[in-house]
């Protein structure tokens, strides 16, 4: 069904009419418009002139922004590094890339094998994927939207700073968007196809669509939702169960064939998302032994994710920066979506298709993703469809006031958004760092925390044996820079030091990298990613000399490489023992046990009582800061040091406090007597006798 809409005038007046014959024909629906309800019909708008020129302009703009903002480094997120590493492992026969989605890693594996880990080349492929996605989607939906809505849906997507950033990345989202566009390009003509279901043309459409759906699911696990969405649409809106069953059959042909390949070649017997589905139910993704989400907990998760993605990130894509997610905005979007679906003016098969697809895909995303992950790339892949849906509703509502008001209103609002996003892109252009990156400087443009961390990782790759196990928090990024594997430790293991040691011993960890990676990558605050630091605390509580500093980088936000020591250094190498205690204080500065041992070492091994007092005072300061009682060994060693410095009176004052707190401790009584033997010989003699008596009683 083709209609002439007031929106067509916006372009036809400016550029003239274009003959219908200039567009590829789409077969009419099996039923006539008279017998089929309007909302089940894929309405087509009168074609407008020069659409290819406009689409080319959008693509040129997106390419220009992507090139100007090109970043030759991998991102600090880590997932994009995983795809590259997985591609290398897949090509070398090490492992099948089954965690984040396999297709992107499989697709780039020949290029990684040919060129090595050459990030700029891989990012050029992502730019091509992004451009192709916008182009193919534009071709696929141009018949079903008013021209103004069509062009701005594509243009605002191309201009979104996050989209430009993603286009020049090694994440799988650009490929996902290309496959998504391919699905829409194939599915919409299939809906109106009149040929028999077993005809050559129908089978070609169905097999192509089944392959695209399978590859989408293989790219990101949420892609399985696309098949569900299309089947729901065919059954509920189109009432075409034959095509629905045929589409499912086509999908499972490819799914089953690939499952057989995985089992025979790689020994993989489960679907790639099975592990994620089990972890989806966890309250804390990084605590497998923790609580499972309840039904109400999942509902809360969906609502919170909807808030942060639709009422925070979505406005940000359009240049509207929010301080926090807006419940009011989310409520408006939900109400507007319902109105668009059910309003007679906007209700059509195409709007129902968009609604069905977006509800299923966004719903699956909001249900499966932990709230704290909060990654914009999870929803930006749906940005052009969201824009098409809501701009169409806005255009129709304004056109009800005046035939030209829809075009004017959409143009003004989208023009302002385009101004904001383009300005944001221009501000993010950094030609100096790009030039350095392309000349081989992998670190140019990194924030100090990441610069320190990756320099340490690179040093470890160059100086440590390949057989060593190095634990760190961001292993994928580390491997890209060091060209060697790392062990990722992402969670806090236990409050029990023995359990933490058991984990590190079980993993045979030889070295540990600790860095101050910012919790907020854009701003340095006191908060940093510290789960691995807390694990180090537990190691140090059990053995204060377990960390030996090998290398560090950075001053304001440093990173450290430690060797994990399991030897008895106190007996075998006293000086190395002292250095290890000092190294532990870098990470755990208020470790009373380490400070006490260092104070004793200064007294007994170095004969440096001033250093002993310094360590004791540091421990006392930490105790006062935290409003804790001062451990008596700290006071004892301080008093001993003060005595050796020639101040028995002050030392006696401290030992007096200790003896009063624990009158049956012969050591305190003896030391007090020792301090008083010149100042008060009589009392000192009595205390020596008491200390001797207490010692005999305790034997």
PLM segments and residue spans:
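Perimembrane helix-loop-helix junctions
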Residues: 9-10, 20, 35, 39-41, ...
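Hydrophobic/aromatic-rich transmembrane helices and adjacent perimembrane loops
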Residues: 166-167, 173-179, 216-220, 225-228, ...
């Amino acid at each position: 069904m083709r209609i002439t809409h007031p929106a067509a005038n916006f372009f036809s007046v400016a550029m003239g009419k274009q003959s219908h014959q200039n567009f590829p024909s789409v077969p009419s629906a099996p039923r006539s418009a008279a017998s089929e309800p309007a909302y089940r019909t894929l309405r087509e708008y009168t074609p407008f002139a020069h659409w290819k020129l406009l689409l080319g302009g959008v693509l040129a703009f997106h390419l220009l922004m992507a090139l100007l903002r090109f970043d030759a480094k991998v991102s600090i997120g880590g997932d994009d590094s995983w795809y590259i590493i997985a591609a290398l492992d897949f090509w070398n026969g090490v492992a099948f890339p089954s965690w984040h989605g396999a297709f992107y890693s499989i697709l780039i594996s020949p290029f990684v094998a040919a060129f090595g880990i050459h990030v700029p080349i891989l990012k050029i492929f992502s730019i091509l994927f992004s451009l192709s996605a916008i182009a193919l989607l534009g071709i696929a939906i141009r018949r079903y939207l008013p021209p103004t809505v069509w062009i701005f849906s594509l243009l605002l997507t191309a201009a979104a700073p996050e989209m430009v950033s993603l286009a020049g990345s090694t994440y799988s989202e650009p490929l996902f968007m290309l496959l998504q566009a391919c699905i829409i390009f194939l599915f919409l003509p299939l809906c109106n196809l009149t040929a028999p279901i077993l005809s050559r043309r129908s089978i070609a459409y169905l097999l192509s669509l089944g392959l695209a759906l399978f590859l989408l699911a293989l790219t990101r696990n949420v892609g399985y939702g696309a098949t569900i969405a299309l089947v729901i649409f065919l059954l509920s809106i189109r009432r075409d169960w034959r095509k629905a069953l045929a589409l499912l059959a086509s999908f499972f042909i490819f799914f089953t064939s690939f499952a057989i390949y995985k089992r025979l070649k790689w020994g993989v017997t489960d679907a790639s998302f099975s592990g994620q589905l089990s972890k989806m139910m966890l309250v804390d993704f990084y605590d497998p032994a923790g609580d499972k989400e309840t039904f109400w907990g999942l509902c809360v998760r969906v609502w919170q994710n909807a808030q942060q993605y639709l009422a925070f990130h979505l406005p940000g894509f359009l240049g509207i920066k929010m301080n926090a997610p807006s419940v009011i905005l989310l409520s408006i979007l939900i109400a507007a979506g319902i109105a668009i679906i059910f309003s007679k003016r906007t209700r059509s098969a195409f709007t129902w298709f968009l609604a069905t697809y977006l509800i299923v895909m966004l719903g699956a995303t909001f249900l499966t993703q932990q709230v704290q992950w909060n990654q914009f790339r999870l929803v930006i892949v749906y940005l052009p469809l969201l824009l098409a849906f809501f701009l169409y509703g806005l255009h129709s509502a304004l056109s009800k006031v005046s035939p030209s008001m829809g075009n004017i209103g959409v143009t003004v609002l989208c023009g302002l958004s385009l101004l904001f996003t383009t300005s944001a892109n221009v501000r993010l252009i950094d030609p100096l760092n790009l030039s350095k990156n392309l000349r081989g400087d992998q670190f140019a443009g990194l924030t100090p925390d990441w610069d320190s961390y990756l320099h340490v990782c690179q040093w470890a790759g160059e100086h440590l044996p390949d057989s060593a196990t190095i634990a760190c928090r961001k292993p994928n990024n580390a491997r890209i820079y060091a060209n060697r594997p790392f062990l990722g430790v992402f969670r806090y293991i236990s409050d029990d030091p023995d359990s933490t040691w058991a984990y590190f011993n079980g993993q045979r960890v030889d070295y540990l990298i600790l860095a101050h990676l910012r919790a907020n990558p854009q701003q340095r605050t006191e908060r940093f990613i510290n789960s691995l630091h807390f694990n180090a605390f537990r190691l140090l509580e059990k053995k204060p000399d377990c960390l030996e500093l090998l290398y560090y980088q950075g001053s304001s936000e440093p990173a450290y490489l430690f060797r994990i020591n399991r030897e008895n250094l106190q007996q075998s190498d006293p000086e190395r023992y002292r250095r290890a205690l000092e190294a532990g204080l870098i990470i755990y500065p208020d470790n009373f046990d380490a400070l006490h041992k260092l104070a004793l070492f200064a007294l007994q091994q170095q004969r440096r009582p001033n250093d002993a007092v310094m360590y004791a005072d540091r421990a006392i300061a930490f105790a006062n800061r935290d409003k804790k009682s001062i451990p008596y060994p700290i006071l004892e060693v301080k008093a001993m040091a003060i005595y050796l410095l020639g101040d028995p009176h002050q030392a006696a004052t401290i030992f007096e406090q200790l003896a009063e707190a624990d009158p049956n401790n012969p050591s305190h009584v003896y030391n007090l007597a020792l301090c008083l033997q010149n100042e008060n010989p009589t009392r000192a003699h009595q205390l020596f006798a008491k200390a001797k008596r207490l010692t005999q009683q305790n034997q």
